[in-house]
Amino acid sequence: MISTMMTSKSKIGMMTKKPEHSGLLVIDKPQGVTSHDVVAAVRGALHMKRVGHAGTLDPMATGVLVVGFGNATRLLNYIVDHNKTYEATIRLGQRTTTDDAEGELLPAGERAVNFPSRQAVEQLITERFTGRIEQVPNVYSAIKVNGQRAYDLAREGKDVELKARPVTIEEFNVRQARYGYTHSDRAGTELAGAVVAERAGDGWIADTAPHEDMQPVMDVTVTCSAGTYIRALARDLGEELGLGGHLTMLRRTRVGRFSVNMPNVMSAHAESKTFTNREGMEVTRNRA
């Protein structure tokens, strides 16, 4: 936590106001809660109203959420514009309405009879998904259309058309490829993936699935500019491979200089709405 104490003088005399607590918290957001939920919990823990965050994470995502309180909220507009790094898992051969595992499955694409080689996938990423690219966000996003959130319009059944936006992909590396089971069988996915990856030896997989219910899965690392949608990358990569694709896991490991590996990262506990440091001590502020 980066914390400061600030005082100010009144216009009448030299009376000093009560010091205002302010600072930044680097929080490891858990899965299943919104960024707004985390902010609300920080307000309760610190007994403060002036709290905000630098860059929304979807409920499915985990990782770095920079939260500012007091005068430090002024810094959030600068922090949100910094580059970000993500670790993600992309499932190929399945499309969803939201481009991630939270959405409903769409009609299946072609079966991945022959999975491309590592060289072919990496060449495609270099040519089409590295540097400055144009990206169309999913309609289930927080982008505003005529003053309304796109996801609100989409949930109301209204037609939403979002324009392509320029983003910059600095790094898009495939760590490994493996086979996993269906969209809903996540436990089976990890087990099967580990077995097949071990057989491959080099972190890649055979060109055919060992079981008809399995689909290819890729673990990737992406460093990108602000405003990049990783689930849109997953969708577009799947389309370029002719298979379709969606995001099944997303973890933000860095926002600017704030990393999930920093010693002062806080763990957020959704049920109790509390925060602890790496030693397990609860973080709060006395009202006095």
Regions found by a protein language model. Give the residues of each.
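Catalytic/RNA-binding core of pseudouridine synthases
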Residues: 2-288
